[in-house]
From Swiss-Prot:
Residues 10-69 form the TRAM domain. Pfam families: TRAM, tRNA_U5-meth_tr. This is 23S rRNA (uracil(1939)-C(5))-methyltransferase RlmD. NCBIfam families: PRK13168.1, rumA. Gene3D superfamilies: 2.40.50.1070, Nucleic acid-binding proteins (2.40.50.140), Vaccinia Virus protein VP39 (3.40.50.150). Disulfide bonds: none annotated. [4Fe-4S] cluster binds at C82, C88, C91, C169. It catalyses: uridine(1939) in 23S rRNA + S-adenosyl-L-methionine = 5-methyluridine(1939) in 23S rRNA + S-adenosyl-L-homocysteine + H(+). It comes from Vibrio atlanticus (strain LGP32). The active site is at C399.
Amino acid sequence: MARFFQPKKKTQLETKHQSVLVERMDHNGAGIAYQKNKPVFIDGALPGEKVVIQLTESKSKFSRAKLIKLLQPSELRLKPFCKHFNQCGGCHLQHLGYSSQVEHKSQSLTHLMSKYQTANTEVALPIVGDESGYRRRARISLFVDKKTQLLQFGFRKKQSKQIENITDCAVLDPRLNVLLPKLKSLLNTFSSLTSLGHVELVLGDTGPVMVLRHLKPLVEKDEQALMTLMTLAKEEGATLYSMPETDKLVRLVGDAPSYSETGVTLPFEPNHFIQVNQKVNQQMVAQAIEWLEPQADERVLDLFCGLGNFSLPIAQQSAFVVGVEGVDEMVQQATANAALNQLSNTEFYQANLEEDLSSQLWAKEKFDKVLLDPARAGASGIVDQISALGAKRVVYVSCNPATLARDSESLEKQGYQLAKLGMLDMFPHTSHLESMALFIKA
């Protein structure tokens, strides 16, 4: 007997306004209320608040809702300091006092890692920096408005591909922030606006760095606009690059950028990864060294080493450091950085850290200690191989507590115990949190 496809009936979404009591916050900073034991996630709502909501999504196990009105605001609620707060997708916790943000993130981390904590696990004090003006890096999106034919200049709106026009960002370092209105005005003088891709801003010790990504070669009549941009860079003591292709940078004005970290100098290209928050990064590196306790006669392995942000400061402690990174260009830069700082007790290798490493020459050696600093996806490809490397101590620096928790299970199975755990607030006023965990072989 033939069966005919019958589409499932769509659940009728209840769109009328409802009042609810917010009981807690989730790890992403959304308020959680309950209706018939089903959680309702409400962006912008705080625990203890009575709010009016409108459902925007209803699933079998949860719902999402839009905050319509505050009936009873929390005493922890503050007026956001940025006029773009409700539109820009960058910050989403400015309505919560900063100390409460730090407390919430710390609690979220310990909750996610509770399975691996013992009575002996030490929870370190959170590492924090400045509440505003902390970002030393930003990518400015560019888009031509079809109606006005003017360049839209700013950041993506919340849950949208549209751009919120911004010429003043409170979390951007003031030395970069001051460039925004000047750049927007100048870029609008280009005749071929649709050929402009984005602007990358980075701050090094040598000053601001500006990168203009253009999708097509600039036409001849835009040469004058480019010359004006070069003049602006000189006036601001900035370095200016053009980026005609994804992997090609052309330095037009200024010196090659670098930053200093715990006594070492790290030159970098503006397309290289560096931590956004310099003050938190400095404390993070210092804490990693303190937890690792590198000794002069030990071998330390730094996985996902990048430019040498951890490797070179550790090498200054006289330990022999082997850094491994997936991107060959970064390996070359780390090697050059070690030579610049006269650190001969280092070696750097390129390797795919998602594959079996037993065939790698460097992996055939034993290591006393290991540091991992993976991307958000975590270190699932290599974490199962840590014990085979012989490490007694492992410091795991994570930008995603969910993958840290997942990888902790593997380390626990290999005989490591969670000795220390700490939260690092690299991105104030967002729900993103960095963390550091120390595992010691039992």
